[in-house]
Amino acid sequence: MPIMIKICGLRTEETLDAALDLGADMVGFVSFSKSPRHVSLDLASHLGKRVGDRALKVLLTVNADDASLAAGIAALDPQMLQVHGRETPERIASIRARFGLPVMKAISIGDYSDLVQIPLFDAVADLLLFDAKPKAPGGLPGGNGTAFDWSLLRHVETRKPWLLAGGLTSQNVAGAIAATNAQGVDVSSGVESAAGVKDLAKMAAFIEAARKPQLSSQRHLS
């Protein structure tokens, strides 16, 4: 199965077009005012129109209420919602039922105890995202450039597909995929020159590196 690649936190036409040209499967737009990657509803609408059918548009929110979700959906017209806060399994089910869109639930992992919640979300979400837990209480829930102990995922079995996030760069993504058997990867700060500023060269290097394990496997099988 091809590795899914998501570039998150896109904020400009140039970087969005680059992500699409490079073959990203998903492009993420952040609707969370505390994030340096936050986009207004108007900008989300403008950028969303450029995507067409070249990738899945993902709206990322954090503990958003129904009104905020409805506004973001109306602006971006996403194919998927990503919830990256303290949303409960019941809240995930409610969002899916109300808006009729697939939901990706981000799960913050710091140690073994954080794995307990995974089956609860696996039962209600359409896709899971395993990310590093913020080091500081009240810190941004994602996009911090820190990784967690990937060996913890050896203990995880899910029915739903999942993406790996947290501290991924072009230097470590191939190893991360090999170590975890991740079905996909999600990157934001790892392809930036500054917080919220995507770097075209880093984006290209990341996607090339993420595809390498798959290409090597295909050559070996042939």
UniProtKB/Swiss-Prot annotation:
Keywords: Amino-acid biosynthesis, Aromatic amino acid biosynthesis, Isomerase, Tryptophan biosynthesis. GO terms for molecular function: phosphoribosylanthranilate isomerase activity. Its EC number is 5.3.1.24. It catalyses: N-(5-phospho-beta-D-ribosyl)anthranilate = 1-(2-carboxyphenylamino)-1-deoxy-D-ribulose 5-phosphate. The keyword Repeat does not apply. Pathway: Amino-acid biosynthesis; L-tryptophan biosynthesis; L-tryptophan from chorismate: step 3/5. One of its GO terms (biological process) is L-tryptophan biosynthetic process. PANTHER family: N-(5'-PHOSPHORIBOSYL)ANTHRANILATE ISOMERASE. Belongs to the TrpF family. This is N-(5'-phosphoribosyl)anthranilate isomerase. The gene is trpF.
